[in-house]
Amino acid sequence: MCRPTWTRLRGGKRSVQGDSGPLIIIGGAEDKQGECKILREFLRLGGGREARVLVMTVATELPIEVGMDYVEIFKHLGAKDVRTFDVSSRDAANRDSAVEFVRDATCIFFTGGDQLRITKLLGGTRIDAAIHDALRVGKPLGGTSAGASMMSSTMIVDGESETNPRIGVVNMAPGMEFLEGAVIDQHFAQRGRLGRLVSAVAQYPHHLGLGIDEDTAVIVEGRHFRVLGKGAVSVVDAGALTHSNLDSVGTNESLALCGIKLHILPDGYGFDLRARMAITDWNEWKGNHNKELTK
């Protein structure tokens, strides 16, 4: 199984060095009726009109209804083939037929629902390995809402909204490890989740916190990501934290965090995951980056 690996930098920071396929991480409630900007980009990355999309409905309790919605959307956008696949047991996730579904797809998409269902049913199975292998050979992996949260190595399971950073306001669990070194939260601005994301990053200061608004996506390619959609992405960086009272306060007591960084990045901006720096014009940066690669 191919897993992303850590690269240690000067100053003790750690960066992401992931598999080669792009990750399309959506904050939920993506546009499905209008321009469908995010889903259209996912499909483009997955092969456009030659795309064979596998929609994973494992997170939802309504796999037929949710799955058919995405089948209709991706077919409307021009996909060559769209299949849904629901996993109801770990035994099913280890079958040869399940692995073949993954191998045959040119791109894989996880719907929303409950992120714990994804890790409980897929973590450590042959499907888990097959999806990581698909990423390694460059196939895109997308996920929305719960399908976004599960992508990190440490994921937010649930927690309080509209709260200041405190001990006990967020519950964490191991994720699927498609993106190391990050903690992801979704429906971010709409549900007032800054407090719980900061609380999570305070407990894991070596991780970046990525808070993704609705109808907004982070598209990770290598060590960089770009932002696409109507909202913004909030990046919480505790790497330069100078003081925390985490070890001296109890449950529900307020956290003191000094030196923490917050970046707010709308459509057209990006982020360097290695340097932990914002990219203020993605298209300009990408053009210059490509020129450097061809020298």
Predicted regions and their residues:
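C-terminal and late-domain segments of enzyme folds
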Residues: 2-49, 61-76, 156-157, 161-295
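General beta-strand structural signal in soluble alpha/beta enzymes
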Residues: 25, 83-85, 109-110, 141-144, ...
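Portal/gating segments that form or line small-molecule/metal binding sites
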Residues: 54, 60-104, 110, 117
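Catalytic-core regions built around general acid/base machinery
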Residues: 100-101, 124-138
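Glycine/threonine-rich flexible loop motifs
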Residues: 115-125
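Catalytic nucleophile loop
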Residues: 110-112, 131, 135-155
